[in-house]
Design a protein with these regions (language model features):
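Long, structured stretches of catalytic cores involved in phosphate-ester chemistry, encompassing
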Residues: 1-177
Length: 177
C-alpha cells in the first residue's frame, strides 16, 4: 500500500467488525439491492470509535464496483478513539510512523481508499441525522475528551462536520460547520 512502512511478513487486521468482516452477508445484501433496483440506501452505524463516511460498492474494486450504499459511521462519545488504540498498539513497531499524528493516519487511509470521503479517527462524539425526501444529512459532533479528573470540559464541542447525500446520488458533500 503506498505510504505504508515495510514490515517483515507482518499481517495486520485493524478491524473485523465491519463490512469486510462479513463478506458473504455483504455480498448477499449488495446483490439483493442491485438485482431489485433498490437505490437511495444509507447506513448509519457506530462502534468503530471514529467518524467516517464513504460509499460501499457492490464489488470492492473501484474500477468495476458500483456504489450501492452511503455508509456513515459515528464515533462513540465515551470510548477512546480508534487512533488512540492504534497508537498504543503500534508503538515501537514499523507501523508507528503511520500513527505519528491523527492527520497522518486519516490522510493515509483516505489516500488508499478512494471511496472514503471523510475520516476522523481521533474523535469522540455523537451524530444527528436529518432526513427529507430530497436529502439525507448527518452531522458529526466532535467533543473534547474528558478532563484528567473525569469531568467534562466547560465548552465540550470541538467541531462539527455535516455530510449530505442527495436523493438518487451517492456523492457526499462534506461541510465543516
Amino acid at each position: 500500500m503506498p505510504g505504508a512502512p515495510k514490515t517483515p511478513a507482518a499481517r495486520l487486521v485493524a478491524d473485523c467488525d465491519a463490512w469486510d468482516g462479513y463478506p458473504a452477508h455483504k455480498h448477499e445484501l449488495l446483490a439483493y439491492l442491485r438485482e431489485h433496483g433498490i437505490h437511495n440506501v444509507v447506513a448509519i452505524t457506530g462502534d468503530l470509535h471514529a467518524f467516517q463516511c464513504g460509499v460501499v460498492r457492490d464489488d470492492p474494486d473501484p474500477a468495476t464496483g458500483v456504489p450501492a450504499i452511503v455508509d456513515f459511521v459515528c464515533a462513540g462519545i465515551s470510548s477512546a478513539s480508534f487512533y488512540s488504540y492504534l497508537k498504543a498498539a503500534w508503538k515501537g513497531t514499523p507501523l508507528a510512523s503511520m500513527v505519528a499524528t491523527p492527520a497522518r493516519l486519516d490522510s493515509f487511509l483516505m489516500a488508499n481508499n478512494p471511496d472514503l470521503c471523510h475520516a476522523d479517527h481521533d474523535a469522540q462524539g455523537y451524530a444527528s441525522a436529518t432526513v427529507t425526501p430530497e436529502r439525507f444529512s448527518v452531522t458529526f459532533n466532535k467533543v473534547k475528551p474528558l478532563n484528567p479528573d473525569g469531568t467534562a470540559p466547560a465548552d465540550a464541542l470541538l467541531g462539527r462536520t455535516r455530510l449530505s447525500v442527495s436523493r438518487d446520488s451517492v456523492e457526499v458533500q462534506v461541510e465543516h460547520i
